[in-house]
A protein has these predicted regions:
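Short glycine/threonine-rich loop/turn motifs
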Residues: 119-120, 130, 143-189
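A short secondary-structure junction signal
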Residues: 89, 125-129, 186
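Glycine-rich phosphate/diphosphate-binding loop of Rossmann-like nucleotide-binding domains
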Residues: 98-154
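Solvent-exposed alpha-helices and their adjacent loops that cap or buttress functional pockets
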Residues: 24-27, 68-70, 104-109, 165-167
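Phosphate-interaction motifs
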Residues: 1-91
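Solvent-exposed alpha-helical segments within well-ordered globular domains of core cellular machineries
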Residues: 11, 15, 115, 133, ...
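Active-site glycine-rich loop that binds ribose-phosphate moieties when present
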Residues: 54-63, 89-104, 131-134, 155-158
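Fold-independent oxyanion-binding glycine-rich loops
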Residues: 37-38, 79-81, 116-120, 176-179
Length: 189
């Protein structure tokens, strides 16, 4: 009496702590896995995870690191109940240690990105193309997009003009320099 099965306990804890954009799988063998329902950033405050884990060794929560980028469908954590049954009051204490629905995924907000690349004689066009391709791959999970791609001479006046041209049409601007920045008087800083 007063005990609940491992699956029911895992499901209760997982359901109570899981918030926005987190899907809880059906518990099986005392384990309820948690999955991201969108691309974004995992919010799993370490102090809250530790507080839940400190309640009793019979109920554990493991998550990916706090503020880690995650993708839709990725497993982000698991609640595991170790014994076949646990006291109902202990499950209530575990749930109370973690604010309701505090484990969540903060979805990315799509951003418009302007890219300005400075050019010097001898810089291969393939270098700029590869830089843009790799950046495009990296921002794709965040649903961000390159809305402007401008290439200008590696000179301060040309860079300033390009920045002014695109500043109002984007949420973010990235400048790729044709040469390394060595001091404050360089073109880019």
């Amino acid at each position: 009496p007063g005990d609940i099965s491992e699956d029911e306990a895992a499901a209760r804890v997982a359901g109570a702590i899981s918030g926005a954009h987190v899907r809880v799988d059906d518990a099986f063998t005392g384990r309820a896995n948690l999955f991201a329902q969108c691309n974004g950033v995992l919010v799993a405050e370490p102090a809250l995870v530790d507080a839940l884990n400190a309640v009793d060794e019979q109920v554990t929560l493991a998550t990916l690191p706090h503020h880690r980028a995650v993708v839709d469908g990725e497993m982000i954590g698991t609640v595991k109940v170790i014994p076949f049954a646990v006291a109902e009051h202990m499950v209530a204490h575990a749930v109370a240690a973690f604010p309701r629905h505090a484990l969540r995924v903060a979805p990315y907000q799509p951003k418009r990105i302007a890219v300005i690349s400075t050019l010097l004689p001898g810089l291969k066009p393939a270098t700029v193309e590869k830089t843009l391709r790799v950046m495009g791959e990296r921002i794709a999970p965040a649903h961000a997009g390159i809305v402007a791609d401008e290439r200008v001479a590696h000179e301060q006046a040309a860079l300033i003009a390009a920045i002014k041209k695109h500043i109002d049409a984007c949420d973010m601007m990235i400048v790729f320099g044709a040469s390394a920045i060595t001091d404050r008087r360089d073109v880019i800083p």
